[in-house]
Every structure is written in C-alpha cells, then in structure tokens.
C-alpha cells in the first residue's frame, strides 16, 4: 500500500480533453467518438455518391468525361492542401467551434473578434446551405425515382410539383432532426454505417453499371472525349473545363465536420486531423472510381442531358435506368441502384445536421448568435438539442426560395461551397501571415512544409471563388446570370453591417466557460 490508504481516484482525461481545458472550455458534450467515427461523419458529408450523382450533369455538360476524369484529381489535389492546413490547425485547437475559434487564436488580440465573427458566420451559413442543398437534392432524387417507377417521363410517369418536392424536403429534415436528437453513441453507429454504405455503394455501382450496360464507351472516349456541346453559348475549351470543375469542388466539401466533432472525439488533437485527411483522401480515390465506372456507360451525352428522356434530364438516373432496361427489358434494377444512392444522400444530410448543430452550439456558447443561451443548451443526453432543431428549421427556410425562383435557390446554394471555402481560407491565411511566427502546432504538424501548403490552399480558394462566380451561359440574361457573387456579397454586407452597428460593441470572440 505504498501510496497510503487515503488516496482518492483521479479520472484520467484524454489528450483532447486536456487540450480543451487549456483552451478555456469545460467538457459538456459526451466524448465518445473514435477516430473512425470522426472520419465517418466527414466522409458521409463529402459523400461522393451524393455529390457526383446530383451534379454529374454539370461535369457532363462542361467538358464531358475528360473534365470528370481529370478535373476530379485536379480539384482533389488542391483540396487536399486545404485539408492538410486545416488538419494542422485543428490539432492545435481541437474545439467544436473549429474554424472561427482558429481564426480568433491566429489573428491576435486586435483582430480576433472580427476574424472570429466573419469566419463563424460564413461557416455556419455555408453549413446550413449545404444541408438545404443535400436534402433538397434528395427530394429531387426521390421525385425522379417515383417518375421512373411509374413509367418515366415518356410513359405517363408521375412528376411531383414544386410544392410536393419542398414537402418531401421538409419531411427529410424532420427525420434528420429526430435522429440527431439521439445520443452521440447512436449517431456514432449510424455514422459508421453511413461510411460503410458509401464505400460499398461506390464499389458496387462502379462495377455493376458498366457491366450491365449493353453499350459501353471506349477507353479512348472516356479519357479523351471533350464535350463542347453544352447548348449554353460557351465554346472556349479552357472556360468549359474550369466550369466542369465545379462538380468536383462542390462534392469535396464539408470535411470541417471532423473539427466540429472534436469535443466528442477521443484524443481529438490527433484524431480530428486524421478524420479530415482520411475523409478527403479516401473520397478522392473512391470518387474517381465511381466517375470512371459510370463514364464507361456514357455513349450519347446530348441524349442523357435532354429533358425529354425518361428521367427528365437527370443524367445518372437515365444511365442506370437504360443500363438495366436495355439488358433485361426492365429498368427496375436501375431504380434500385438509384435507391442505393438515395440512402447515401440521406446519410449525408443527417451528418450535415450533426455538424451544423455542433457549430451552432459552439458559436452560441461564445455569444455570437441571437438568443445564444437557447442554442447552446445541452440536454440530459449531452446533445445540443435546440441547435439541432434550429439547423433543420433554417435549412428548410433556405429551400423555400426554390418556390419563388430556381435562380434564387441556386444562388443560395452556391454559398454552400463558396461560403464554406471562404471560412476554410480565413484561418489558413492568418496562419501563414499574422501567426507565421507564433503558431504552435499540435501533435499533427506539417513542419517546414506548413507555409507552402498553406499558401497553395489559400490561392486555390481564391481560384475557385472566381470560378464559381463566372457566367455559366451566354448571352447573359436575368435567367442565366450567375448570382453567386451577389449572394456572397450579400452575406458579407449583412455580417459586416451587423458587426459595425452592433456586434463590435459586445462580441469579443471565444469565451472561456471553465468558471461558468
């Protein structure tokens, strides 16, 4: 009994919890996620089945298989630089606030409140837009599945109205909010299931679809055919190619979820960065396989994009449907394959709400949101329950813009990519400028390459911000104008105005809750 009989038991905190306390926060959420669970949430939000399937038309229209095959690796490589820089910062600051907390720490005392404010609002609005976009895409996919199941566009199939689609969207969000009200241990299991579903789904579809197809593209076609027949008045090869990159960049986003889940992840200073990097890396590999497999079933691009085909112009749905119909005389197998994708999209939306709610919880914990005390409330299951339902409600309201104008909805959805990547870039640029000599890395460090990778990441975000703002059709009219710059400028104007007239007087950046 060498230490004496009055020794009391002292619980051992893991490295992530120790670091959280050093940063000024007490543990309020249940820390129960493994490194695989952390990865699974980001991987499920990236969800190559979701992003590629729902935006395949864009890649096919702008450059075809060449843009899809080569553009995916180009966008993926630069996105990995963004992810590596984020992972390094995450290792040093593993909190649910993620990006906005990083900005505050890296900007220094003078600029911390403003940097934190702008990063936080771009991040959370971008996340809400992602959820709105994903669940609306699922509602549209369900509509296409119903259309094909009832005979297709040319066989008297049922196509729901815009109000039906928005109703489905609302129902999906309601289910996602219910699921996210469950304990984190349950969400961890569902997240792991979602990751496995995405992995297996990609493997099955990338092999099955070209195998079943009676007409296959040649390898030369897949790797060299450049489609310029976009019907949108754009003829420049370079311009067409960069517009086609939008599919890839839209897909590989949302991996900041691993950072937002760090307060619920064991050894978060190590496993948070691993979650970010592995989610991006595995998504790049599996996404390319999915693109390649599907592209071997592409033989007539104009027909796939035509709104007069059975799926109403939904290219991948038409590919799946025709593959089975031409082989077996029935497109039922193709509809089942679309069901596999739909489940992946469902998981993607669910994980998006999980990430949204943790960001809202952390941002309100620091007093940045209206009615902050309400949104950072944690229930008996250690779940930020009010933030969950807030995220679902706002995402639903965002999708309501589709009833007024699809152009307005597309502008809002564009914030899902641009808003998030601007939020990604702010802490990185602070890391390589103001904090270049003061930043102290955590267990994961890029070492001497940190500055180079950081600058590459920043330049890539600037590049894609320009690309997403380019006109996508000529001549430019009110219907064809790309309203992305307007949407982003509007968000900047609102957040800066809020700051100048109100928040600068009371928002000081992240607030310690150790003593509360």
Curated annotation (Swiss-Prot):
Residue stretches spanning the membrane: 33-53, 70-90, 113-133, 164-184, 189-209, 232-252, 275-295, 328-348, 383-403, 406-426, 452-472, 483-503
Chief place where the protein resides: mitochondrion
Keywords recorded for this protein, A-Z: Amino-acid transport, Membrane, Mitochondrion, Transmembrane, Transmembrane helix, Transport
Phenotype of the disrupted gene, per the record: No visible phenotype under normal growth conditions, but mutant plants grown on medium without sucrose show strong decrease in root growth and plants grown on soil under low light intensity have reduced rosette leaf expansion.
Localisation: Mitochondrion membrane
Domain of life: Eukaryota
GO biological process, one term: gamma-aminobutyric acid transport
Any one GO molecular-function label of the UniProt entry: L-alanine transmembrane transporter activity
Tissue and organ distribution: Expressed in roots, rosette leaves, stems, cauline leaves, flowers and siliques.
InterPro entries registered for this protein in UniProt: AA/rel_permease1, AA_permease
Gene Ontology cellular component annotations, sorted alphabetically: mitochondrial membrane; mitochondrion
Membrane topology: Multi-pass membrane protein
Primary role: May play a role in primary carbon metabolism and plant growth, by mediating the transport of GABA from the cytosol to mitochondria. When expressed in a heterologous system (yeast), imports Arg and Ala across the plasma membrane and exports Lys and Glu, but does not transport proline.
PANTHER family, alphabetized: AMINO-ACID PERMEASE BAT1
Family that this chain belongs to: Belongs to the amino acid-polyamine-organocation (APC) superfamily. Amino acid/choline transporter (ACT) (TC 2.A.3.4) family.
Protein name, as recorded: Amino-acid permease BAT1
Source species of the chain: Arabidopsis thaliana (Mouse-ear cress)
């Amino acid at each position: 009994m060498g230490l004496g009989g009055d020794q009391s038991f002292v619980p051992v905190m893991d490295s992530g919890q120790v670091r959280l306390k050093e940063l000024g926060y007490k543990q309020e959420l249940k820390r129960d996620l493994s490194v695989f669970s952390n990865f699974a949430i980001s991987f499920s939000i990236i969800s190559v089945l979701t992003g590629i399937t729902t935006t395949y038309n864009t890649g096919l229209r702008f450059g075809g298989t060449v843009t899809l095959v080569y553009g995916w690796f180009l966008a993926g490589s630069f996105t990995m630089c963004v992810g590596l820089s984020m992972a390094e910062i995450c290792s040093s600051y593993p909190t649910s606030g993620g990006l906005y907390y990083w900005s505050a720490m890296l900007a220094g005392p003078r600029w911390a409140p403003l940097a934190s404010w702008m990063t936080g609002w771009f991040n959370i609005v971008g996340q809400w837009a992602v959820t709105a976009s994903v669940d609306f895409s699922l509602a549209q996919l369900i509509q296409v599945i119903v259309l094909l199941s009832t005979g297709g566009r040319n066989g008297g199939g049922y196509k729901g109205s815009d109000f039906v689609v928005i109703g489905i969207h609302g129902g999906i969000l309601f289910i996602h909010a219910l699921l996210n009200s469950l304990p984190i241990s349950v969400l961890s299991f569902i997240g792991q299931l979602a990751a496995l579903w995405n992995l297996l789904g990609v493997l099955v579809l990338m092999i099955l679809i070209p195998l079943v197809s009676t007409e296959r593209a040649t390898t030369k076609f897949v790797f060299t055919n450049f489609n310029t027949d976009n019907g949108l008045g754009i003829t420049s090869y370079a311009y067409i190619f960069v517009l086609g990159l939008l599919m890839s960049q839209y897909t590989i986003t949302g991996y900041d979820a691993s950072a937002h889940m760090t307060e619920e992840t064991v050894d978060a200073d190590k496993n948070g960065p691993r979650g970010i990097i592995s989610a991006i890396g595995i998504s790049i590999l599996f996404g390319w396989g999915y693109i390649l497999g599907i592209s071997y079933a592409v033989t007539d691009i104009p027909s796939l994009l035509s709104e007069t085909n059975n799926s109403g112009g939904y290219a991948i749905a038409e590919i799946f449907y025709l593959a089975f119909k031409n082989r077996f005389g029935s497109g039922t197998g193709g509809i089942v394959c679309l069901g596999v994708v739909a489940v992946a999209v469902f998981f993607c939306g669910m994980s998006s709400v999980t990430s949204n709610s943790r960001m809202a919880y952390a941002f309100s914990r620091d007093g940045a949101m209206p009615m902050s005390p309400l949104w950072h409330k944690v229930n008996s299951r250690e779940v930020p329950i009010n933030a969950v339902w807030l995220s679902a409600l706002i995402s639903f309201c965002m999708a309501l813009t589709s009833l007024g104008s699809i152009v307005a909805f597309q502008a809002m959805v564009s914030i899902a990519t641009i808003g998030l990547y601007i939020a990604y870039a702010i802490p990185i640029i602070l890391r390589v400028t103001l904090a270049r000599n003061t930043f102290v890395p955590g267990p994961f460090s890029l070492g001497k390459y940190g500055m180079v990778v950081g600058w590459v990441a920043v330049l890539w975000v600037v590049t894609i911000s320009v690309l997403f703002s380019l006109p996508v059709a000529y001549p430019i009219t009110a219907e064809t104008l790309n309203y992305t710059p307007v949407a982003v400028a509007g968000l900047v104007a609102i957040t800066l105005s809020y700051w100048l007239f109100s928040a600068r007087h009371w928002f000081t950046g992240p607030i310690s809750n150790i003593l509360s």
